[in-house]
Amino acid sequence: MTASWIILIAFALVGLFAASRAWPVRPTHGVRLNGEHEDDVFEGSTLSVATYNIHRARGLDGEKNLDRIAELVKTCDVVGLQEAEGTSLFRRHDQASLIGRMLGRLFHFSTTRRLLFFPQRGNGLISRFQTQSWETTPLFPSTGRAHRNMTVYHFEWAGVPVAVINTHLSKPAEGESPLEEVMHAFGQFPRAVLLGDFNAPVHHGAMRRFMPSDTKDALSGLDDQDRVDMILVRGLKVDQAWSRPVGPSDHPFFAAQIRPVN
């Protein structure tokens, strides 16, 4: 075998290795959400927010059905999605953009990992209202293929800034640094909503240790001690909270109605 063939095979093996690995992504930032929906300035007295781990739209029946997910998402103003499917050689659009277009809403797909050079998996946001800006931060350390991030979305609510943070974290036993970083970011804003799947209940020691002291669990009245999906708020009042059972996904849909603190 000639040297040129050896070099060619070596490059091919390196390429196959790089393409088959799930890679984290770099920090990104932007201004506006995507979509053709007209920019609405939110002036209402209350805002409905939700968090939903959509499990790639695969329900407990094994069927992948994005329509069932969209039916729940459309009931709220701002919805943070986790475990959203990205694009690939055979998928032109990520699931956040598909839901956004189905509902005529603004949307953003926040890539957590790349596979075969495509944004394969991530979180997402579906919103009735446009952002002032947003920024995505990768979270480390990560384990295996489970790369994580958080995205901070900056909204203006009747002239008042409100930050909405969306994330999906691994269990604290696999590393507490990502949770600490998310909670630190959450504590930087006077009015903030933290959405996501934390893979830990609110009473977990790490959650209690890192949460800002003035944090309110918007879903506390639902009486689900083992819940790992969170809507946490600061500088905001919770009017009511509700959930919808598993079925369209292996996670329930959780929502809350909030308002500014006078």
Which positions does each model-derived feature cover?
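Cell-envelope and extracellular/periplasmic
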Residues: 84
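Active-site regions of metal-assisted phosphoester/phosphodiester hydrolases
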Residues: 1-74, 78, 90, 101, ...
